[in-house]
């Protein structure tokens, strides 16, 4: 949606749910859209396709540049890195794969099963992924050539989904699950 900041006039609005599929009865808009170079990528899981919008130079109109069902991120976020999107998709509430798409075209570079869908962050040249069902954390080399897992570990077993997003500060990886905050030193020794 684009709005005139002075008058409140709506220039344009986009309904991802209505226009690009959705599992019946589901509404899930938990991902922050990504803006780059006059374009917006948005996704929201439950089979709503990921959609790239191209804005007019004045921002008062937008049109769909491409759409792709391979990256319909449930609630784990998406990373834009060097012209490629990385994230996980929603197959159903129990399953999802990890995906890399080309920003300009929506072309699927790869799609890989790794435990389950989840959240993703980027720091110091690496992707950190956290799957939501069993608490596995993986370290990935960003690549358009395939899913390149460097290492992985699993959080101590606890009940419930692993939905919190990780964060990194001062060479420490912070991971919350329930009432527990895990802190891992990820600095080079």
What is the predicted role of each segment?
Residues 1-189:
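Noncatalytic, solvent-exposed loop/strand surfaces
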């Amino acid at each position: 949606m684009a709005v005139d900041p002075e008058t409140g006039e709506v220039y344009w609005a986009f309904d991802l749910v209505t226009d690009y599929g959705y599992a019946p009865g589901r509404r899930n808009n938990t991902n922050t859209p990504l803006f780059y170079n006059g374009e917006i990528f948005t996704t929201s899981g439950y089979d709503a396709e990921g959609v790239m919008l191209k804005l007019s130079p004045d921002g008062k109109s937008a049109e769909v540049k491409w759409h792709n069902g391979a990256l319909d991120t449930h609630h784990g976020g998406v990373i834009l890195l060097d012209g490629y999107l990385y994230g996980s998709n929603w197959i159903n509430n129990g399953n999802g794969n990890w995906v890399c798409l080309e920003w300009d075209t929506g072309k699927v570079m790869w799609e890989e099963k790794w435990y389950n869908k989840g959240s993703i962050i980027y720091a110091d040249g690496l992707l950190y992924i956290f799957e939501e069902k069993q608490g596995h954390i993986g370290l990935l080399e960003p690549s358009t050539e395939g899913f390149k897992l460097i290492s992985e570990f699993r959080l101590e077993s606890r009940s419930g989904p692993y939905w919190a997003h990780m964060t990194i500060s001062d060479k420490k990886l912070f991971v919350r699950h329930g009432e527990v905050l895990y802190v891992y030193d990820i600095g080079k020794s």
